[in-house]
UniProtKB/Swiss-Prot annotation:
An individual GO BP term: anaerobic glutamate catabolic process
UniProt-listed InterPro entries: Cbl-dep_enz_cat, Glu_mut_E, Glu_mut_E_C_dom_sf
EC category name: isomerase
Gene Ontology terms for molecular function: cobalamin binding; methylaspartate mutase activity
Essential cofactor(s): adenosylcob(III)alamin
Family: Belongs to the methylaspartate mutase GlmE subunit family.
Protein's UniProt name: Glutamate mutase epsilon subunit
Enzyme Commission number(s) from the entry: 5.4.99.1
Pathway(s) per entry: Amino-acid degradation; L-glutamate degradation via mesaconate pathway; acetate and pyruvate from L-glutamate: step 1/4
Positions bound to L-glutamate: R67, R99, R148, H149, E170, Y176, Y180
Alphabetical keyword list: Cobalamin, Cobalt, Isomerase
Reaction equation(s) it catalyzes: (2S,3S)-3-methyl-L-aspartate = L-glutamate
Source species taxonomy: Bacteria, Pseudomonadati, Pseudomonadota, Gammaproteobacteria, Enterobacterales
Length: 481
């Protein structure tokens, strides 16, 4: 079947569902869709993700959410019980085997974790644990819960998660393929995520609003805002077509105050612009700001500075929520104590800037207009390639290099675009590849980069890019020689 941005019919969905539920033994727990609906209807309002986001947006507050997940359910429950005292929203980060649908290996990881008395997986294997165990998790905790993962084919995970009482689901057919996988085709991942979104849409039709969040940071490495914005908007459109009504579009901090504030503000405005221009009006929109996703310094004091800076910018830019980091980021998966330190530092800063939204200024306005022009140029070409169909257009756009994510592993990603910082730390385009930015915009990027090159007395080359990638872990933003 040729990929199209068209709502799956009930028969199409149910026929596919029969096969999805057979991919692991716990699929039998969710054969009765109505059972999942009835369980979701028992969840109180204070534990519903979409309501928490809606309330925060109305009140102008920025909510905090960490990342966290371990192999065994009892330990995971204890971890989240500890974290919920310091955050507004809770995660369940999924392990790497589940992300690749390698459930047998996840089962081995559970066994080894039991034997070792500590987690041997980098997340919670929800599919292996099944509905009963996961319902124990959602019933024990008192904050809204979201599944955070990185799964190109997240269909069975979605089924078990929703029937278990999670009320938000991160990811998308682009953002959980291009940065995470090498050999998964976009046709397959987008189609598999149409199933996930249709599942959420079916819950919506039964009065259950599930929040959906495309993954904004992508590779987390020098991502120009227009690239992540374009993909977030595409995934939002794909979700809306399948009946999703609560969308959170995301963005990963780049470190430039002007560009980060402009990015969050333009992301919300552009999402409304495209959603409404394509006929979607009945939806709730929120934004998420991811604290710095690149390399961290090993020194905890320096790490706290990065965490606090991210929280400050998230709050001042008006983001609905911020995904926090820990001072152990350079060392690997953080302990609960380190995670709490990151949450506390973030909350202190969020409280201090709560009434201090970043004021309008010419520099931010110029950056907003630049990002909007770039996104429109890219998305217009994507729609053109697909003859108006955003799903088909996306596949063709990646084939043509029109959509191109820096430093991504996917074979279907051109990898020709090369970003670099300008003299103020904003992310600019050094080499555009086939990304269809207008000449005047490319000239502007060239001028920004040339200004930095003159200041540093060197040519803008790949070495400058490498220096920028390593800069923050070396206590700088710009990779000066």
């Amino acid at each position: 079947m040729e990929l199209r941005n068209k709502k799956l019919t009930h028969d199409e969905f149910m026929t596919e569902r029969q096969q999805v539920l057979k991919t692991w033994e716990t699929g039998k727990d969710v054969e009765n869709f109505e059972d999942g609906v009835k369980y979701q209807q028992t969840i109180p309002e204070h534990k519903r993700f979409s309501l928490a986001l809606l309330k925060a947006d109305k009140e102008g507050k920025t909510l905090s959410q960490p990342r966290a997940g371990v192999a065994l359910m009892d330990e995971h429950i204890e971890l989240l019980k500890t974290l919920q005292e310091e955050c507004d929203l809770l995660p369940s980060t999924i392990d790497a085997y589940t992300r690749l649908n390698r459930y047998e290996e996840a089962a081995v990881g559970i066994k080894k974790s039991i034997e070792a008395g500590t987690s041997k997986l980098n997340g919670l294997p929800v599919v292996n644990h099944g509905v009963a165990a996961c319902r124990r998790l959602t019933e024990t905790l008192q904050k809204p819960l979201q599944i955070r993962h990185g799964t190109p084919d997240a269909r069975l995970l979605a089924e078990i998660s929703m029937a278990s009482g999670f009320t938000s689901y991160e990811g998308g057919g682009i953002s959980y393929n291009i940065p995470y996988a090498k050999r998964v085709t976009l046709e397959k991942s987008i189609r598999d995520w149409q199933y996930c979104d249709r599942l959420m849409g079916m819950y919506e039709e039964h009065g259950i609003r599930i929040n959906r969040e495309p993954f904004g940071p992508l590779t987390g490495t020098l991502i120009p805002p227009f690239i992540s914005h374009s993909i977030a908007i595409i995934e939002g459109l794909l979700a809306l077509e399948q009946g999703v009504k609560s969308i959170t579009v995301g963005y990963g901090q780049v470190g430039s105050l002007t560009q980060d504030v402009a990015a969050i503000q333009s992301l919300r405005e552009l999402a409304h612009e495209y959603f409404q221009s394509y006929g979607y009006t009945d939806y709730e929109l929120s934004t998420v700001f991811h604290q710095w996703m690149g390399g961290f310094p090993e020194d905890e004091s320096k790490a706290f500075a990065i965490i606090s800076w991210g929280a400050a910018v998230a709050g001042m830019s008006g983001a609905t929520k911020v995904i926090t980091k820990s001072p152990h980021e350079a060392w690997g998966i953080p302990t609960a104590a380190a995670n709490i330190q990151g949450l506390k530092a973030s909350r202190q800063m969020l409280n201090m800037v709560n009434e201090q939204k970043f004021p309008p200024c010419p520099a931010v306005e110029l950056e907003i207009e630049l990002i909007k022009s770039e996104v429109r140029a890219v998305l217009n070409k994507v729609f053109e390639l697909g003859n108006g169909d955003i799903a088909r257009g996306t596949v063709l756009a990646f084939e043509a290099g029109v959509l191109d994510v820096p430093f991504a592993p996917a074979a279907c990603n051109a990898g020709k675009i090369l970003p670099v910082r300008d003299n103020t730390g904003a992310i600019r385009v050094l080499e555009a590849g086939a990304v269809p930015l207008p000449k005047d915009i490319l000239d502007l990027h060239h001028d920004y980069v040339a200004e930095r090159a003159r200041c540093e007395g060197r040519q803008p080359t790949f070495q400058m890019v490498v220096d920028d990638i390593n800069a923050v872990s070396h206590s700088k933003l710009i990779g000066r020689p």
